[in-house]
Amino acid sequence: MAMQKIFAREILDSRGNPTVEVDLHTAKGRFRAAVPSGASTGIYEALELRDGDKSRYLGKGVLKAVEHINKTLGPALLEKKLSVVDQEKVDKFMIELDGTENKSKFGANAILGVSLAVCKAGAAEKGVPLYRHIADLAGNPDLVLPVPAFNVINGGSHAGNKLAMQEFMILPVGASSFKEAMRIGAEVYHHLKGVIKAKYGKDATNVGDEGGFAPNILENNEALELLKTAIQAAGYPDKVVIGMDVAASEFYRNGKYDLDFKSPDDPARHISGEKLGELYKSFIKNYPVVSIEDPFDQDDWATWTSFLSGVDIQIVGDDLTVTNPKRIAQAVEKKACNCLLLKVNQIGSVTESIQACKLAQSNGWGVMVSHRSGETEDTFIADLVVGLCTGQIKTGAPCRSERLAKYNQLMRIEEALGDKAVFAGRKFRNPKAK
């Protein structure tokens, strides 16, 4: 079925920054998609095109990207008369029309907006749910509901506290369904609020960009201690484990790491990658930490490799791999990590996101689907994670509607699948393992 009209507009994301929204019309109706945006971005990500006009939105407008869709990409696609079910052909056409390595001509935010809308239209054209259409595109006969990784304590570039590490997450792996995982996550979250309020006062329960709390603590193990206490208080020590996103590239300084990077710089306190690795090993030993994302800088390959060989938990590449097949291949070859963080806007199209996922999975890696800190009410990634059978998703705390939009959509999907619903649970790293 051909596209009839493609129209893009500038909307606001959850941080009050502009982003791109696309409406695509076919005979079946209107299909709308909005593009997310990150705060801590890897230097190898596809280019997010911003206007740079300081008199509008402090330079963060996206009118150029919107215009590229309305004046160039849209008309070219309509003229080409491609079918919305041919996701790969549509994406390939846009990528070739852009012609740059990192989508810098039109902007990854322009190309992705159209790509997401096409995917939604393709599902409607086939008369199947979006998650089923995505599973078909990926060649997956199965569907799996993911374990949610709730980011309940925020630090790093997401919060105004002194905490260096960016995210402390809870994963209810012992739940029997996604719906139960949501309940357990929400209950631990509420207990955590009480624990933080009692220890640090009411101000400490203000939430960060992703709905997690941002108490003004400096020591990272203090955050882990708070989680441990809340998990115990909620009564789930056997069902909930911990994940972290360190985002270490944010505090990498001249070959070393600064765990107090929000204070005035003092090279005397910078530590080596090896020393930082020892700290992580102490976390793994003392807390139920099962996953660490971006433990080192995006170009500190040697430290990644030596660390991975000495631990048996999930080590996730985000800034390291940026959902990019070339970076993933490099990480596989160097044995740098064993899980890919999948963010659709890092690579900039649905087809390339699926390819990145398949590449990681074919090399025995886990895959975790992820939101960005600047989100919208769009729920595409909820369907994506089910269709790609990755078994794990992180899309914030059970707080703030742009986060809950995804979690609630996952509950609806589980309900629609009925007794065919499979929840990843403790097999979140490899949900297809029998």
From Swiss-Prot:
Localization per record: Cytoplasm
Principal place of residence: cytoplasm
Active site: 210, 343
Lineage top rank: taxon: Eukaryota
Binding locations of Mg(2+): 245, 293, 318
Sites bearing Phosphotyrosine, chain numbering: 236
Phosphoserine, modified sites: 83, 157, 176, 263
Keyword Lyase: yes
Tissue/organ expression: The alpha/alpha homodimer is expressed in embryo and in most adult tissues. The alpha/beta heterodimer and the beta/beta homodimer are found in striated muscle, and the alpha/gamma heterodimer and the gamma/gamma homodimer in neurons.
Swiss-Prot/TrEMBL cofactor(s): Mg(2+)
GO cellular component terms attached to this protein's record: cytosol; membrane; phosphopyruvate hydratase complex
Protein name: Beta-enolase
Source species: Rattus norvegicus
